[in-house]
Amino acid sequence: MLLRWYSIILITLLFVGCGGGERARLANPNTSYIPLVGGPGPEEGGYDSISYWDGDGVAGPPSIKIYLKEQRAYFYKGDQLVGVSQVSAGREGFNTPAGSYRLVQKDKDHASNLYGDYVDALGNIVRKDVDLKKDAKPPGAIFRGAPMPFFMRITGGVGMHEGYLPGYPASHGCIRMPGKMAQKFFYNVDVGTPIQIVD
């Protein structure tokens, strides 16, 4: 009899542990996660248990809230949360500016005009990860801007785009996102979409 009760309790606990799922936890912006540090970003095959999209077929005006401390972006249609993305915002000294903005530009195939590589005439990298403000061009080299696919300009030189996510703020001020999420955000916003960036 005692064994039967233990079995019932064990089965009940198993079912309770399965309830809610990932999305129930992600819908609460106060939920904390331990980020993957030092590994590849989600677009490079790493596991991303944070990002999701449920906005297809949902009506309502788009808006985005980015929480820098959480390194998360939340996509809303009307008042409904339809997507969450892991992000990597600006590192120390290149902080992503907090504030309220409206999307000013969309460029699917954008490349940086400030950060990238110096390459030779054949496209071989001569000097990697250069900053045009600081790094002199070697003789015969040309500048190739860092690719920023699905670029959504927020203000000045800051935008959201597909990029590497190491699990902490690492960019020059932009908000990097996994490729699948950059695409979803890109195709669901228009110029003028409100974006709020919170410290």
Say what each PLM segment does.
Residues 10-12, 110-118:
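Hydrophobic alpha-helical targeting segments used for export or membrane insertion
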Residues 18, 22-24, 29, 94, ...:
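Exported/periplasmic cell-wall-interacting domains
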Residues 79, 106-110, 184-188:
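Structured segments of extracytoplasmic/periplasmic soluble domains
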Residues 68, 77, 105, 156, ...:
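Pocket-edge structural micro-motifs
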Residues 1-18:
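Sec-dependent bacterial lipoprotein signal peptides
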